[in-house]
Regions:
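Alpha-helical transmembrane segments and their juxtamembrane interfaces
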Residues: 18-20, 138, 486
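Beta-rich carbohydrate-recognition and catalytic domains
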Residues: 27-181, 185-228, 239-292, 314-370, ...
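Generic N-terminal leader/processing signal
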Residues: 1-2, 6, 16, 136, ...
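Bacterial Sec-dependent N-terminal signal peptides
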Residues: 1-29
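Beta-rich accessory regions
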Residues: 242-244, 272-525
Length: 525
């Protein structure tokens, strides 16, 4: 039986074009097709997982898996970029190079304020990088000792790095997959804690000096999704929004088994951590996806976020096709930085993700839609007709209309399109990229991402960010998110709001017939 509901815009549909700061243009001097304009991407060649996210002395540091000699995966280095606002990035020289012990896989960075490692030389606290060494020769020989943990330190705010003379700091002899250390300071016991991905679970280690580690526990062999190898853990303590209560959240990526195409994806667990191990607050089989799109992987949280904020960045690609996407000179981008909040909902504790308020500075032109719209003869409103970079905020109250779905459709003059919407019959948000342009480089790429709506609020909220080759959708204040990349042959410059039947829009304030107003804001450089 078809659901009947009314679409009522309670506020205004706002579509905003972005204005870019000169430093961002400088980061990407070329204007190659699909080059992101408000997401971080490397100047050239290969990038994957974000590593070592840390806020220190007024700068956000983004390190990342990087191969500087080709646009496909190769011997891993740590690339490096810094930002003062998480909007504009400056790429710095490579931070860590492979050496005789192996390639430099993923890891994390902490601020050693107490100089527990004894590596300080100078006035500022050292930054300590804990990372995985990967020995290719041992891997070829099927050795169980091909991955182990190393350390490096910096005494000049991350500009130069020196590796610890007696690496490795944590050896391995029993696991093929033994990687991606996530380290933080556990103040109740004045010690460091490491969360390490070990095949089908994570292990916990502790240390007083960041150099000698002891195993304390493990988690996950029978918990959550196991469609692929576990990677890139991020364990955080976070306040329950609006309360004084605190919970622990373990963010955990998996190499296969994602909700849309079975590819790489990221799940999370809510529970407790006692300094030795993690205890899941939900049933073993319960799976919470961080993102229902195909392209948000290896997501990790900044160490030392200002004002105790938990800010997350993910790699905006998927291992099913990352090496095949049709870009030139460079490959991959990062998601927008997102602030995490933990809320106690009617369905239990859930992570919410919100785009940072700092992105408002990129807004330029504004279009308002208000009043009754889309009556009997029309089911489409053209919102934007000449902008390739857009932010869309939509609020809809579901009551009595005949339309079973509504969507925002981005398109170009050659008929390619990307559709982002909500289906009331199935209660799913979705991104449909099957007609978005170049989709035949990998059979799994032509997909429709579906995200079940978990909120029972009568108001649908969708906050959408459209770059030239990516879309991020924050639904219901970030309770549900979807992230996808796409590759049109020409930029999408037209945005339509579409209902599949008689779609009614009505503002809270007036009963006037539909008006579309354009407002233009000159923003400061």
């Amino acid at each position: 039986m078809q659901k009947m509901f009314v679409l009522k815009i309670q506020l205004l549909l706002v579509v905003v074009s972005f204005l870019f700061h000169s430093t961002l243009v400088a980061q990407n001097p070329d204007s190659l097709p699909h080059r992101p304009q408000f997401h971080f991407s490397p100047k050239e060649n290969w990038m994957n997982d974000p590593n070592g996210l840390v806020y220190y002395k007024g700068e956000y540091h983004l390190f990342f898996q990087h191969y500087p000699k080709a646009t496909v995966w190769g011997p891993m280095h740590w690339g490096h970029a810094v930002s003062k606002d998480l909007v504009h990035w400056e790429q710095l020289p490579i931070a860590l190079y492979p050496d005789s012990l192996g390639l430099i896989f993923s890891g994390s960075i902490v601020i050693d304020s107490l100089n527990t490692s004894g590596t300080k030389s100078g006035e500022v606290a050292p930054l300590i990088a804990i990372f995985t060494y990967h020995d290719l020769e041992k891997e070829k020989n099927d050795s169980l000792n091909c991955q182990f943990q190393g350390m490096a330190f910096s005494n000049d705010k991350g500009r130069t790095w020196k590796k610890y003379a007696t690496n490795p700091i944590l050896k391995n002899g029993i696991h093929k997959d033994f990687r991606d250390p996530n380290v933080f300071w556990y103040s109740p016991e004045n010690k460091w804690v490491m969360t390490l991905a070990v095949g089908d679970h994570v292990e916990f280690y502790d240390s007083k000096d960041l150099k000698s580690w002891n195993k304390t526990g493990e988690f996950g062999k029978n918990e959550g999704s196991h469609g692929g190898v576990w990677e890139c853990p991020s364990l955080i303590k976070i306040k329950v929004d609006g309360t004084k209560k605190e919970k622990w959240v373990l963010i955990q990526s998996i190499g296969r088994g994602g909700p849309t195409d079975g590819g790489s994806a990221t799940q999370y667990f809510v529970g407790e951590f006692d300094g030795t191990t993690f205890k899941n607050a939900n049933s073993n089989e319960k799976i919470f996806w961080l993102d229902y799109g195909s392209d948000n992987y290896a997501s990790v949280v900044f160490c030392n976020g200002p004002d105790n904020k938990h800010i997350l960045i993910g790699w905006m690609s998927n291992w099913l096709y990352a090496t095949k996407v049709p870009t030139e000179k460079w490959r991959s981008a990062m998601t927008l930085p997102r602030e995490l909040k933990l809320k106690d909902t009617e369905n239990g504790f859930r992570l919410f993700q919100e785009p940072l308020k700092t992105f408002k500075e990129l807004r330029k032109n504004q279009v308002f839609i208000k009043s009754d719209a889309l009556r009997n003869k029309k089911d489409t409103i053209e919102v934007i007709h000449n902008s390739k970079l857009n932010e869309i905020y939509l609020e809809v109250n579901l009551q009595k209309t005949k339309a079973e779905s509504f969507s925002v459709v981005a398109s170009n003059r050659v008929g390619e399109q990307l559709e982002i919407g909500y289906n009331a019959e199935s209660h799913n948000y979705y991104i449909d990229r099957t007609k978005s342009g170049k989709v035949d480089f990998e059979k799994s790429f032509s997909s429709v991402a579906l995200a079940p709506r978990t909120s029972n609020n009568s108001e649908i909220k969708m906050h959408i960010f459209l770059d030239v080759a990516s879309v991020e959708v924050f639904c219901d204040d970030g309770e549900t998110t979807l992230t996808d990349i796409f590759f049109p042959t020409e930029d999408f410059t037209k945005i339509d709001l579409v209902g599949n039947k008689n779609l009614f829009l009505k503002t809270k304030a007036t009963g006037e017939k539909v008006e579309t107003r354009n407002k233009f804001y000159e923003l400061k450089n």
